[in-house]
Regions:
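Intramolecular chaperone/auto-protease modules of tailspike-like proteins
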Residues: 1-94
Length: 94
């Protein structure tokens, strides 16, 4: 087996609600608006999805951007949908 400590019952909705989607532009491209997350904020919630360090610079003083691997958010989104669906079914059942 390649995996261990597999858990299927975890609270994705609470975790997902901690993410703060934002609309912004990069300083180098003021004309283009982007919907996304600020990597350093997302890192506090989903550290496995974020690479790099906030405000890191290289030897020449140039910023090294953090990045978010959006695909690592997919399991969190799917689990949240499942949790919300179960909640809807429960509420509709009365």
């Amino acid at each position: 087996a390649l995996k261990e400590n597999v858990v299927y019952d975890w609270d994705a909705t609470t975790r997902l609600k901690q993410l703060k989607p934002a609309r912004f532009n990069f300083i180098a491209d003021a004309e283009t608006t982007v919907d996304g997350f600020l990597a350093h904020e997302a890192q506090a919630v989903v550290p496995e999805a974020v690479g790099g360090t906030k405000d890191e610079v290289d030897d020449d003083g140039q910023a090294i951007m953090q990045g978010i691997d959006q695909s690592k958010l997919v399991p969190l989104l799917v689990k949240t949908i499942q949790e919300l669906e179960a909640r809807i079914v429960s509420l509709e059942a009365g």
